[in-house]
């Protein structure tokens, strides 16, 4: 692209997107910002986070001398991300709303809006990269292994990547902070946001219970012994330790308790003791709702590495054709802990992200 072409940067109010915009300006691009409102203020129990974020984004835009556009995608977010997640939680699965948000809001609604403003590219503060050869694009891991966010971007295809820039792809987070402070960016010391995007740092169970009715049932061992009561299967995820309320049970001194499974038919939560309990391990999984960055699946079977959750180390595996034409089987070289239906499994070869899919079922260790 020419440096006179317009790039619209998604300014969130955070330091990453601010430095992304600054680096593009320094490279000579025509840069404008866009602040997305994806969650309605009246749906929060505390202060108005969106107003605070907007104020930070505007301060950054003013400091950089760029225009800041605003767009309200809250209705689309509720329908295409939040309601989808609620359905998944009610079905006993654990969705990843950040991946849905990237797919349906940031790289669809935001991208379309930016193009309508005359942009040729959009940019975000994600720690990932885009490669290009012969008019074909690849999604690359960010250079900083501790911040790489390609896991959350695996649904991006050729149409999105051709219009996308990730200016932080080669930077570690401490360097981003250093550049922000050196440039005097007004939000250089703002701490990173954490938690699920629409929940933030609020209590997960309390927030979700506003939308999903509590449905108590038994907590059981695999042998059928009832050891407690859960508040509703939607509020728990596989591998979870905190919030079970099972500490200090008599005749159970084998260690901490973990969620191992959900019996939806009986509304029973299956729990086990010990971080490495065999019931927490899986030898394989089936994934569908597949997305391939190249636009078409690779030839199977295929040796690659995968992540079945964010921040997991790459796990070597065999990728095979699945039980249906739209699914794949992942066979791990080493059994993996807490493989969770509803979460995403993402496929890699070296630095290149091939794509990924949604975990449907897992094969427990025999």
UniProtKB/Swiss-Prot annotation:
A Pfam family per the record: tRNA_Me_trans
Subcellular location: Cytoplasm
EC number: 2.8.1.13
Keyword entries, A-Z: ATP-binding, Cytoplasm, Disulfide bond, Nucleotide-binding, RNA-binding, Transferase, tRNA processing, tRNA-binding
Family: Belongs to the MnmA/TRMU family.
NCBIfam families cross-referenced by the UniProt entry: PRK00143.1 (NF001138), trmU (TIGR00420)
Site (Interaction with tRNA): 126, 343
Binding-site residues, ATP: 10-17, 36, 125
S-S pairs: 101-197
Organism for this UniProt entry: Alkalilimnicola ehrlichii (strain ATCC BAA-1101 / DSM 17681 / MLHE-1)
Spans annotated as Interaction with target base in tRNA: 96-98
Active-site residue numbers: 101 (nucleophile), 197 (cysteine persulfide intermediate)
A Gene Ontology BP annotation from the UniProt entry: tRNA wobble position uridine thiolation
CDD domains linked: MnmA_TRMU-like
GO cellular component, one term: cytoplasm
Catalytic reactions on record: S-sulfanyl-L-cysteinyl-[protein] + uridine(34) in tRNA + AH2 + ATP = 2-thiouridine(34) in tRNA + L-cysteinyl-[protein] + A + AMP + diphosphate + H(+)
UniProt region (Interaction with tRNA), positions on chain: 147-149, 309-310
Cited function: Catalyzes the 2-thiolation of uridine at the wobble position (U34) of tRNA, leading to the formation of s(2)U34.
SUPFAM superfamilies registered for this protein in UniProt: Adenine nucleotide alpha hydrolases-like
Annotated protein name in UniProt: tRNA-specific 2-thiouridylase MnmA
GO terms of molecular function: ATP binding; tRNA binding; tRNA-uridine 2-sulfurtransferase activity
């Amino acid at each position: 692209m020419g440096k006179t072409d317009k790039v619209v940067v998604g300014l969130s109010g955070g330091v990453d997107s601010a430095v992304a915009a600054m680096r593009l300006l320094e490279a000579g691009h025509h840069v404008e910002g866009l602040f997305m409102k994806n969650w309605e203020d009246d749906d929060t129990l505390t202060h108005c986070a969106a107003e605070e974020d907007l104020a930070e984004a505007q301060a950054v835009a003013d400091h950089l001398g760029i225009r800041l556009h605003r767009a309200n995608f809250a209705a689309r977010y509720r329908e295409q991300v939040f309601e989808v997640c609620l359905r998944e939680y009610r079905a006993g699965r654990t969705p990843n709303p950040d991946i849905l948000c990237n797919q349906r809001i940031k790289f669809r609604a935001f991208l379309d809006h930016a193009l309508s403003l005359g942009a040729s590219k959009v940019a975000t503060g994600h720690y990932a990269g885009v490669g290009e050869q012969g008019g074909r694009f690849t999604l690359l891991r960010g250079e900083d292994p501790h911040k790489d966010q390609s896991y959350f971007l695996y649904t991006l295809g050729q149409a999105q990547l051709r219009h996308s820039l990730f200016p932080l792809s080669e930077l570690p987070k401490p360097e981003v902070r250093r550049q922000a402070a050196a440039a005097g960016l007004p939000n250089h010391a703002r701490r990173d946001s954490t938690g699920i995007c629409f929940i933030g740092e609020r209590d997960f169970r309390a927030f979700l219970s506003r939308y999903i009715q509590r449905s108590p049932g038994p907590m059981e061992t695999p042998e059928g012994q009832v050891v407690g009561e859960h508040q509703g299967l939607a509020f728990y995820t596989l591998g979870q330790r905190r919030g079970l309320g099972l500490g200090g049970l008599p005749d159970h001194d084998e260690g901490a308790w973990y969620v191992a499974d959900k019996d939806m038919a009986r509304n029973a939560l299956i729990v086990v003791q010990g971080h490495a309990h065999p019931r927490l391990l899986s030898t394989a999984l089936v994934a569908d709702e597949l997305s391939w960055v190249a636009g078409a699946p690779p030839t199977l079977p295929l040796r690659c590495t995968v992540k079945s959750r964010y921040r997991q180390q790459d796990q070597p595996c065999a990728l095979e054709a699945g039980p249906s034409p739209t699914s794949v089987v992942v066979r791990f070289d080493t059994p993996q802990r807490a493989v969770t239906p509803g979460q995403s499994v993402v496929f890699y070869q070296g630095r290149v992200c091939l794509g990924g899919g949604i975990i449907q079922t897992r094969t427990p260790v025999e």
